[in-house]
Amino acid sequence: MDAGDASRLGESLDAVSAAFQSRVMELQELVLARNMYPATAIPDLAAVDVSLTAMEAQLQAVRRRLQEEREAFPKAKKLVQQSLKQQRRLQLMLANMPTGMREDVFATPLEHNSSMMFPESLNFSSAVPEVRDHDLKIKEEPTAPPKKGRGPAPRWYISTEELDSLSSYMRGRLTLEKVNIAINEVASYADGNAHLVACPKKKLSEDTWEKALELRDIAARESVKGRHFFLETDIKGPGLKLDTTGKAILTVLRHLGRFQETRIGHHRVFILSKQQ
């Protein structure tokens, strides 16, 4: 609804109010003519007056609401103009962004969010003038190559077919759920060790730093280098413990190739395998 519609609606309400008041006056005259005695006419007139007052209050409320909406039009128009101006600025920034920085931006989830914030229907290409290299030159600074993290530890869950392929004495009372819960736990142990190996000294306590040094020595071994591992001393449940069931699970996982086992120093080291 624009300002013209609001003005016409206000005029219509004024006309309705005038007609309503004229009708009330006619009703008052009819009430006076109908009643022979003033004692009975006064209550009727009082009831009409109350109804009229309520209707006038409602009409005033509608009129105030229309006035508020009419005053809000300039503010809304200004807000739209500012939004369009900001969109043009963002488009100019994007057009002149260094190549390396642009790759970093579009490699993040912000790309999806920006596509939701600025749909194709806005058509920035028609609203923003083309900016050439000689109009606005930005010196591109060399960007450091992204650091390659080791990634999460492999979680190579077993299938029902693999569990059924085991001999009955090896499988025992193990279930698919128990074994896969254990796989998830040993992967979390390996993730924790990888974090300690990569964490700088200033972020670790003295006791934790000693363990981190020990893990770094193990991680530097040729048979372990670049792979996720956990130690026998890391195993502490609840899904995997060093009891009869836990040892049976470790035997099954080793048999199915989920890890390789070796001994480094006084540690029994389990090196996780990636899914083939």
Curated annotation (Swiss-Prot):
GO terms for biological process: attachment of mitotic spindle microtubules to kinetochore; cell division; chromosome segregation; mitotic cell cycle; regulation of microtubule polymerization or depolymerization. InterPro entries: SKA1, SKA1_MBD_sf. One of its GO terms (cellular component) is outer kinetochore. GO terms for molecular function: microtubule binding. Keywords: Coiled coil. Residues 48-78 form a coiled coil. It holds the Pfam family SKA1. Belongs to the SKA1 family. This is SKA complex subunit 1 homolog.
